[in-house]
């Protein structure tokens, strides 16, 4: 099987004999039931391929769709004028880049259709004029497809890049790009009667930055149950298209076919984009894993978006204060250019996803989607938060290996050494509430990374919960941590709260570990096992 890794052109996939997961039934539904759409999905999730497929569909290239669902659904196969703008691949941190790109696109289209341009008009006005001209000349309404509509904004989000406009005014490029896009998108309102179909894709839905205020509000299908699987790969699609490839991967890795399916699911599945909660696999990582026949962090290795790194560096919110909570959609769907509210950007960038839906309150539980994101994203955050030379993921590997050998002494030494390596400037907290917050967040980061290697939970008991319970094939480890307390206090709590009771019938030995953490030294100062 040939995997279309890095190929986003539908025609190239078909002509090259690459595997294609058929999404054309959803595309047909989209083009027959609506007119102007917006779709938000994380990077490398198939948005560009979706746009490309629509381009060839509206181009009337029926032969490319032989054997696909849409071949039987579509009867007409009409050809429409298609205007495709792809903002991928351009750097919009320079003041003139966006305007120049739009000017070049419109000028090329004017030449293509034999229309004389008018430099006195804005680029949005010229585009609206062009759409009307092409509609009248061809007798066909126009199709506009814009891929990564928000990249000119994300490139300069939360920066102070500046430029001088034509009137000599000194402007932030973020503001300039926003105004330029607003003016360009206003063409859609002026040309409504000339439009057959419009799709804008991107990572982020900008709410109060006025990008969409200039034209008819698009139908946002980002959380639509009908379109939740329009990008990405479902479990049914994985089994139906890649069954033999998963078996071959299992053979290569020396595990059973069922084990390889569980590995793929834990590492790349877990995305949900609607209240229906259909499991969606990350397509980029999944295809890479099947091609290479190995489990690696393919999506995360392509890099965390710079805009998200900037945003996180400027916020005081810790991830443990954002995850595991129920939210109204207004809290995580619309980004309002507020660095104090990073949740929408983290969610829309693919680092958090929907894990549950509460119908009574119409709210959504958000958390990390899968092990790839847990390990990569939390390691990145831990590096910035703790400032250690050794990564938190390296520590997690050491802790995992120690517990699998039932070696608590090495476990303690590794954890103690890691805490000792945290610079004083990173852990210095003056207020008691700050000390508590630092203590809880540090352990949250370490143990959630550890959970990608071992069965690790914060077990809810009727009497309360242990700080952490780790299960290995040969043992159960119940940890209780105290800040500026004693290890005896921690062990006493384990007994009094009955944290070990669920394991009374377990054949594995149960280890109770009390740990005291010193806010003064920033490391472990008392440790006892029972």
Feature annotation, model-predicted:
Residues 184-191, 344-352, 441-449, 493-513:
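Metal-dependent nuclease catalytic cores in nucleic-acid-processing enzymes
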Residues 443, 466-483, 497:
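Conserved catalytic cores of phosphodiester-cleaving nucleases, focusing on short active-site segments
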Residues 143, 475-477, 511:
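Structural motif
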Residues 166-179, 483-500:
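Mg2+/Mn2+-dependent nuclease catalytic core
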Residues 1-435, 450-451, 471:
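Phosphate-binding site recognition
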Residues 446-461:
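A short acidic/basic microdomain associated with nuclease active sites
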Residues 459-461, 468-472, 503:
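C-terminal amphipathic alpha-helical interaction region
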Residues 502, 506-530:
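Domain-level recognition of nuclease-like catalytic cores that cleave nucleotide substrates
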């Amino acid at each position: 099987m040939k995997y279309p890794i890095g190929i986003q052109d539908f025609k190239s996939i078909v002509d090259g004999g690459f595997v294609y997961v058929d999404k054309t039934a959803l595309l047909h539904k989209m083009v027959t039931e609506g007119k102007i759409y917006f779709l938000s999905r994380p990077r490398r999730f198939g948005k560009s391929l979706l746009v490309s497929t629509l381009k060839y569909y509206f181009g009337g290239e029926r032969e490319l769709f032989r054997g696909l669902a849409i071949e039987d659904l579509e009867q007409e196969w009409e050809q429409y004028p298609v205007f495709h703008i792809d903002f991928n691949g351009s750097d919009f941190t320079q003041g003139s880049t966006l305007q120049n790109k739009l000017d070049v696109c419109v000028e090329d289209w004017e030449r293509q259709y034999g229309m004389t341009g008018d430099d006195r008009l804005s680029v949005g006005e010229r585009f609206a004029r062009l759409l009307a001209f092409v509609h009248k000349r061809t007798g066909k309404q126009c199709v506009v497809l814009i891929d990564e509509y928000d990249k000119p904004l994300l490139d300069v989000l939360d920066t102070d890049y500046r430029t001088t406009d034509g009137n000599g005014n000194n402007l932030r490029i973020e503001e300039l790009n926003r105004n330029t896009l607003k003016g360009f998108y206003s063409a859609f309102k002026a040309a409504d009667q000339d439009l057959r179909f419009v799709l804008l894709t991107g990572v982020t839905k900008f709410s109060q930055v006025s990008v969409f205020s200039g034209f008819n509000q698009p139908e946002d299908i980002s959380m639509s149950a009908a379109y939740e699987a329009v990008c990405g790969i479902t479990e049914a699609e994985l089994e139906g298209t890649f069954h033999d490839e998963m078996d071959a991967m299992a053979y290569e890795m020396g595990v059973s076919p069922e084990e390889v399916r569980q590995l793929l699911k834990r590492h790349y599945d877990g995305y949900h984009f609607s209240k229906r909660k259909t499991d969606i696999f990350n397509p980029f990582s999944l295809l890479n894993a099947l091609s290479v026949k190995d489990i690696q962090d393919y999506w995360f290795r392509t890099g965390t978006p710079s805009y998200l790194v900037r945003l996180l560096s400027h916020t005081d919110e810790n991830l443990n204060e954002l995850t595991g909570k129920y939210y109204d959609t207004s809290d995580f769907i619309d980004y309002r250019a507020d660095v104090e509210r990073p949740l929408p950007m983290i969610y829309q960038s693919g680092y958090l996803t929907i894990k549950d839906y509460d119908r009574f309150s119409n709210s959504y539980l958000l958390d990390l989607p899968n092990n790839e994101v847990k390990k990569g994203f939390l390691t990145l955050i831990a590096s910035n938060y703790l400032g250690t030379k050794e990564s938190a993921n390296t520590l997690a590997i050491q802790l995992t290996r120690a517990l699998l050998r039932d070696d608590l002494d090495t476990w303690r030494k590794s954890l103690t050494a890691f805490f000792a390596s945290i610079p004083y400037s990173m852990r210095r907290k003056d207020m008691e509430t700050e000390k508590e917050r630092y203590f809880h967040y540090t352990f949250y980061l370490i143990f959630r990374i550890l959970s990608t290697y071992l069965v690790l939970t914060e077990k809810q008991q009727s009497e309360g919960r242990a700080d952490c319970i780790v299960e290995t094939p040969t043992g159960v480890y119940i940890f209780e941590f105290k800040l500026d307390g004693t290890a005896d206090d921690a062990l006493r709590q384990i007994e009094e709260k009955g944290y070990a009771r669920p394991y009374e019938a377990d054949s594995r030995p149960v280890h109770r570990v009390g740990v005291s953490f010193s806010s003064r030294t920033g490391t472990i100062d008392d440790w006892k096992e029972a």
